[in-house]
Amino acid sequence: MSEPVQSLMQAGAAAAPETVAESDTGFLWDFWYPALRSTEVRGNGLATAMLLEVPLVLGRTSDGKAFAMRDSCPHRGIPLSYGRFDGKTLECSYHGWKFEACTGQCVEIPSLTSQDKLKVERIFAGHYPCEERDGYFWVYMNSHGSRLPETIAAAPKLTTFSEKYRITHLACELPSHVDQGIIGLMDPAHGPFVHQSWYWRRRHSIHEKEKKFEPIPNGFRMSPHTPSSNSAPYRMLQKYTGEPVTTTIDFVLPNIRTEEIRSGKLWFSSRATVTPVRRDLCRIDFVAAWNLLLPVTIFRIFAKKFLRQDQETMILQAEGLKHNPRLMLIDDADRPAKWYFGLKANWLDSRRTGAAMVHPMSGPVTLHWRS
């Protein structure tokens, strides 16, 4: 059974409860997104980023607290990132308006006189909750004009299984809408063609696979299983430990794929997010940690090539998508993509109606495909 991709994408956008501009983007608001690496912010310096087509200025206060503000002065629109930051307040370079970095509240307008009755404290620059975690500045992107909930869950944290481990971060941009990036990330059938190599898998190694999936809150899980026998790293790990190798893969809204691999006392944990930048641009932010005897430099060589292969494929796909072709999703290999669109549409619908979200999976299911 096949379904048009366009209709699934449109269903997700049409259900959005916010402004027309927001619904047209197909983005999911009121979630945490990684804006940039922690290393990009130094001392009292400022850094800029864009999430969901919102320009941001980010930094740390003198006491080390991360903050994120809309990079636009509410007075005349000049980017606040051109201003001066003293560790507590951010001063606009145009008229000297000052804003408290962690709240966005205006604290000074130099042009006001004793005759003016303007209540400065009622003016706010755009501000978003911000946390540092796993080497990223995470920003909670609440929808335009909406009030923040009284409590917000903490930003996502990479799962680790020992006190000592190695960790590394990688990123690459994809010239596509975030939906295309996400369904590409979860696609199980492209490996032997896009990622074929002597150390991963070869084209002739394609064989039928059976995987069990189960629903989880806001997502789905590929249940713990023995990983692909046609992938050399897994075979090497089992040979080294003498223990079975199991892997568990989760996807949760809005854009997070995690994978945990265990074999005896050894483990590998990774998270990939497809971060929406603009309607035509997204970014894979990848972080991995492990206690294997694998140097970071060696892992990065292979991981960079792996991500570059995905990036090159998405660049080629973007050429075809310029002409708005009719696309389709098939069973069973594309079923995870269908679940993603179902999750997205149902989450947006629950926001609009106030009703509980209906999960597109009624229960555990077994899928079959060849890869």
What do the predicted segments below correspond to?
Residues K65, L148-S371:
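C-terminal catalytic domain of Rieske-type non-heme iron oxygenases
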Residues S2-A11, A15, V20-D24, P34-F161, ...:
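Rieske [2Fe-2S] iron-sulfur-binding domain
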Residues Y33-L36, A101, N142, R202-H204, ...:
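Short, isolated positions within intrinsically disordered regulatory regions of eukaryotic proteins
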